[in-house]
């Protein structure tokens, strides 16, 4: 498959590890590089993990601890055998002269490696994210070269990652002086209340958009209209009494689960205290 047809999907844990490696870099290091781990399926490169590779860049050469990279990859394979080398990453907002040398190494480790750059300097006010593949150039029998060509890149996340990101966002609006060191998950009922409140605000936003379109205040968007039509068709047809009965049944089940989990927690705490109780 041609590398130009690839699309890169990056998970949040990758960005966190890149930023952590950048913050822990040596004082004389201008950028940090590392290995991207993930999988390739039907033209989609899904990057789910990564690790840093210590290196030094000189004017005419690059020194990288390749044995360290191999050891880290072997250790990761013992934990998750489904993650393979799919490319490499580097901090910064551009491709440097040394990038082609590093890319040659990863081209021996996997087919069509992708190169991901993460702008940790926040020059544009955001963490710029770009993905490239290397296209070989040259004429038969002559000198050959390569050119880094941008390919589409997007952020994606699993459901647990999305839940964790929502918890982290709760500390964004808090001042550093009052920002908590830990964030505990909300109780189930509190999550339902927050989700219902957010759903209500989104419905109000949709209704305002529809009213503005009808009043010719906003130019209609066909794509939005199709999505709204699909949304309406996805709503199950039921009466108000049926919905109330189903909702109450789900709430009762949720309350039962909460009660049982609290009983189990109390039982475990009591058992722990009895275990360490001194005997006469």
UniProtKB/Swiss-Prot annotation:
Gene3D superfamilies (alphabetical): Cytidine Deaminase, domain 2
InterPro entries, per database record: eIF3f, EIF3F/CSN6-like_C, JAMM/MPN+_dom, MPN
Alphabetically ordered keywords of this record: Cytoplasm, Initiation factor, Protein biosynthesis
Molecular-function annotations in GO: metal-dependent deubiquitinase activity; translation initiation factor activity; translation initiation factor binding
GO biological process: antibacterial innate immune response; defense response to Gram-negative bacterium; formation of cytoplasmic translation initiation complex; positive regulation of Notch signaling pathway; positive regulation of peptidoglycan recognition protein signaling pathway
Domain MPN: 8-138
UniProt cross-references to Pfam families, sorted A to Z: JAB, MitMem_reg
Location(s) in or outside the cell: Cytoplasm
GO terms for cellular component: eukaryotic 43S preinitiation complex; eukaryotic 48S preinitiation complex; eukaryotic translation initiation factor 3 complex, eIF3m
Domain of life, per lineage: Eukaryota
PANTHER family: EUKARYOTIC TRANSLATION INITIATION FACTOR 3 SUBUNIT F, EUKARYOTIC TRANSLATION INITIATION FACTOR 3 SUBUNIT F-RELATED
Function: Component of the eukaryotic translation initiation factor 3 (eIF-3) complex, which is involved in protein synthesis of a specialized repertoire of mRNAs and, together with other initiation factors, stimulates binding of mRNA and methionyl-tRNAi to the 40S ribosome. The eIF-3 complex specifically targets and initiates translation of a subset of mRNAs involved in cell proliferation.
Description of how the protein assembles with itself and partners: Component of the eukaryotic translation initiation factor 3 (eIF-3) complex. The eIF-3 complex interacts with pix.
Family classification: Belongs to the eIF-3 subunit F family.
Protein name in UniProt: Eukaryotic translation initiation factor 3 subunit F-1
Species: Drosophila mojavensis (Fruit fly)
